Amino acid sequence: MPKETPSKAAADALSDLEIKDSKSNLNKELETLREENRVKSDMLKEKLSKDAENHKAYLKSHQVHRHKLKEMEKEEPLLNEDKERTVLFPIKYHEIWQAYKRAEASFWTAEEIDLSKDIHDWNNRMNENERFFISRVLAFFAASDGIVNENLVENFSTEVQIPEAKSFYGFQIMIENIHSETYSLLIDTYIKDPKESEFLFNAIHTIPEIGEKAEWALRWIQDADALFGERLVAFASIEGVFFSGSFASIFWLKKRGMMPGLTFSNELICRDEGLHTDFACLLFAHLKNKPDPAIVEKIVTEAVEIEQRYFLDALPVALLGMNADLMNQYVEFVADRLLVAFGNKKYYKVENPFDFMENISLAGKTNFFEKRVSDYQKAGVMSKSTKQEAGAFTFNEDF
């Protein structure tokens, strides 16, 4: 065995010392951050308490109309079981079924994301501010997916009775699990310190601003008195408005040629969430009795205020070199599109300020899948479904 030279021993000792110093500094930073967040959390609790009171007061002012709509929900076709319909075919709700087939054709798995090049970028190309920003974005995504899936499993998938919509929600639950796995893998890959990982995985409790988003979401979607239509709007606002700024910030990294694994997974997840948001709008359109447009507007604009505040105070986009005013405008642009989809008028009346988000923002346009030909769809799924519904003759039918 070769004898260790004094210079190598000194170098190893220095390396160990640097690692220990680095860990010590990280622990100090985390403790400082926790203390700052404890102070923020105390202030936020007071704000959330006031927000909850204002929320109840606002809904009380619409009590009579909402009570009538709640009673009328008993007659909603989407929410009432058709005991004579025991099998899926023949399809009754064709638009809803096509939404399911689009989701099915977009299936992917976490194993398809190559993170090997990201490690180099994370350690050598990204600065401390950028690493801080991305780690917090991933923490929010991981926390939000838990809320989304819980709502799907406990509420929407059991409340909606038509088989076409149940098919979509069943698939969405599975794909949200894949999103959750992907976010966890990303955090595990980039964040090597166990204490920091724990801090990020518990973001709802450790990062007050993410906790505020969660509280707002639960206030709307887990309220027993909330109308189904109101909860659809809130759910779409989570996946549409709350995710919009974070998606845009990661696409900004792609524009700079960084983090290919992260940005590719972001493309896939952004596309999925777009389908999920569109589906919420589609179900809303099928409701016979819709919520008051004023309440729809309030839900969406509340989400915008929280999202804009999040990127102003908690996670300044300047850390990535992005313009904060343009980010605010982008969130408003996304919100306007959502309001129009729900039958409301535009509230903000702004243009999309991010050219790199143009094709992503427009429904049906997905030209950013460079790793796959033809929209990353499983071969023939959509074409087969469309032909079957149209009654088209095909040469592979059984005779």
From Swiss-Prot:
It catalyses: a 2'-deoxyribonucleoside 5'-diphosphate + [thioredoxin]-disulfide + H2O = a ribonucleoside 5'-diphosphate + [thioredoxin]-dithiol. One of its GO terms (molecular function) is zinc ion binding. Pfam families: Ribonuc_red_sm. Induction: Induced by DNA-damage. Keywords: Deoxyribonucleotide synthesis, Iron, Metal-binding, Nucleus, Oxidoreductase, Phosphoprotein. The active site is at 183. The modification Phosphoserine is found at residues 15, 24, 41. Belongs to the ribonucleoside diphosphate reductase small chain family. This is Ribonucleoside-diphosphate reductase small chain 1. It comes from Saccharomyces cerevisiae (strain ATCC 204508 / S288c) (Baker's yeast). The lineage of its organism: Eukaryota, Fungi, Dikarya, Ascomycota, Saccharomycotina.
